[in-house]
């Protein structure tokens, strides 16, 4: 199935490092890890080269992801089928599926990535593959807390693996028990991020987790002694931003956090108080609002190593793949592209992330001042600023 009004077939990395990028999905049975287990896509440096277009994985692994996204957006399956066939088509991620890990470095730093509400493990591939091209191993978790647009788990029945869908849970704003539901979800998300870190530690020790449901065909032994477990970071967008804060509050094994346009609502007072690891906040001024920023400012005050920056002319989805899935005119129509070019927003997100991960607050601030001051400010503000 081709796309007729789309950008190039492979999503090009915006700030490519020295490495080609490989990827591999890993799903582990919940009976081993408890609850619903773990599903994630690992992105990592590779020395391999793509044989042909089929080496690159599809951005939409199954049509159900589009249908679930449509449900989240209030669009019918029929309409999403049209959008998928005419716009998305066989869009592919810029990484080589089933590639081997690069042997050019002794060890690789690790990052766990948490998607936003209605997201998936593939919706941030531009960012994740770009980080991997700079020498990071990125574990993009697909959350099973009913916040992903759609996901699934595999269960054994009569000797065969059966796919059980996990659909998005739609919650009306101000619905009774809304906070309780969202806080429970963020708790589940934290559990999955910690599980991802634990699985990476197992792989680094040369141990393959029990009951691997997806990924049995891969040589995981190559991860042995290749990961820098002492400096793990957690990164997330929106709901994933809250997840990254709550994860770093839960365990200091996450040495740093990065929050893209974070949604603070799901965090309870304990999580807010305990989020004290050095954190980079990258906000979109047009999306943030005062009530949300009040919580964020409280967390920012916990550590002198925290840094908050605001992107001007950007949109909430500028950290995801969506601005690059659609041609510019359609991206603007759908509200996934703002006044500032998506490529510039993504470049800033990637380069500031690298600067913060490698050189902390001072490194990110220096880069912002030298390169991105035309559209990124140290002022913390939301949409109310424009109503004055």
Curated annotation (Swiss-Prot):
Record-annotated active site: 238 (nucleophile), 261 (charge relay system), 316 (charge relay system)
Segments traversing the membrane: none
E.C. designation(s): 3.1.1.47
InterPro entries: AB_hydrolase_fold (IPR029058), PAF_acetylhydro_eukaryote (IPR016715)
Domain of life, source organism: Eukaryota
GO cellular component term, pick one: cytosol
GO MF annotation list: 1-alkyl-2-acetylglycerophosphocholine esterase activity
GO BP annotation list: lipid catabolic process; morphogenesis of embryonic epithelium
Catalytic activity: a 1-O-alkyl-2-acetyl-sn-glycero-3-phosphocholine + H2O = a 1-O-alkyl-sn-glycero-3-phosphocholine + acetate + H(+)
Catalytic class of the enzyme: hydrolase
Entry keywords, A to Z: Hydrolase, Lipid degradation, Lipid metabolism
PANTHER family associated with the record: PLATELET-ACTIVATING FACTOR ACETYLHYDROLASE
Family: Belongs to the AB hydrolase superfamily. Lipase family.
Name of the protein in its database record: Platelet-activating factor acetylhydrolase homolog 2
Organism in which the protein naturally occurs: Caenorhabditis elegans
Gene (name only): paf-2
């Amino acid at each position: 199935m081709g796309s007729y009004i789309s950008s190039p077939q492979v999503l090009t990395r915006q700030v490519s490092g020295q490495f080609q990028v490989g990827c591999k999905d890993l799903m582990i049975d919940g009976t081993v890890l408890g609850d619903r287990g773990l599903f994630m896509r690992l992105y990592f440096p590779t020395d391999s080269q793509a044989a042909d277009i089929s080496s690159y994985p599809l951005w939409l692994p199954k049509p159900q992801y589009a249908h679930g996204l449509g449900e989240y957006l209030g669009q019918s399956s029929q309409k999403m089928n049209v959008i998928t066939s005419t716009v998305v088509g066989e869009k592919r991620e810029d990484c080589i599926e089933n590639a081997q890990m690069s042997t050019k470095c002794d060890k690789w730093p690790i990052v766990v990535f948490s998607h936003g509400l209605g997201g998936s493990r593939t919706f941030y591939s531009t960012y994740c593959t770009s980080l991997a091209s700079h020498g990071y191993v990125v574990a993009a978790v697909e959350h099973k807390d009913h916040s992903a647009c759609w996901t699934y788990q595999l269960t054994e029945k009569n000797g065969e693996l059966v796919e059980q869908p996990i659909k998005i849970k739609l919650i009306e704003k101000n619905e009774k028990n809304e906070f309780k539901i969202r806080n429970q979800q963020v708790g589940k998300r934290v559990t999955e991020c910690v599980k991802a870190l634990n699985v990476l530690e197992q792989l680094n020790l040369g141990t393959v987790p029990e009951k691997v449901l997806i990924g049995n065909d891969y040589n995981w032994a190559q991860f042995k002694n290749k990961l820098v477990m002492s400096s793990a970071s957690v990164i997330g967008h929106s709901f994933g931003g809250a997840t990254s804060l709550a994860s770093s509050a839960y365990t200091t094994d996450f040495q740093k956090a990065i929050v893209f346009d974070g949604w603070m609502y799901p965090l309870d007072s304990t999580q807010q108080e305990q989020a004290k690891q050095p954190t980079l906040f990258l906000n979109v001024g047009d999306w943030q609002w005062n009530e949300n920023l009040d919580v964020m400012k409280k967390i920012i005050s916990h550590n002198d190593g925290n840094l908050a920056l605001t992107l001007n002319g950007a949109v909430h989805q500028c950290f995801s793949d969506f601005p690059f899935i659609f041609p510019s005119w359609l991206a603007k129509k759908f509200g996934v592209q703002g006044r500032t070019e998506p490529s510039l927003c993504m470049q800033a997100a990637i380069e500031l992330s690298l600067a913060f991960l490698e050189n902390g607050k001072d490194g990110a601030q220096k880069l912002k001042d030298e390169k991105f001051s035309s559209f990124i400010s140290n002022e913390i503000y939301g949409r109310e600023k424009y109503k004055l």
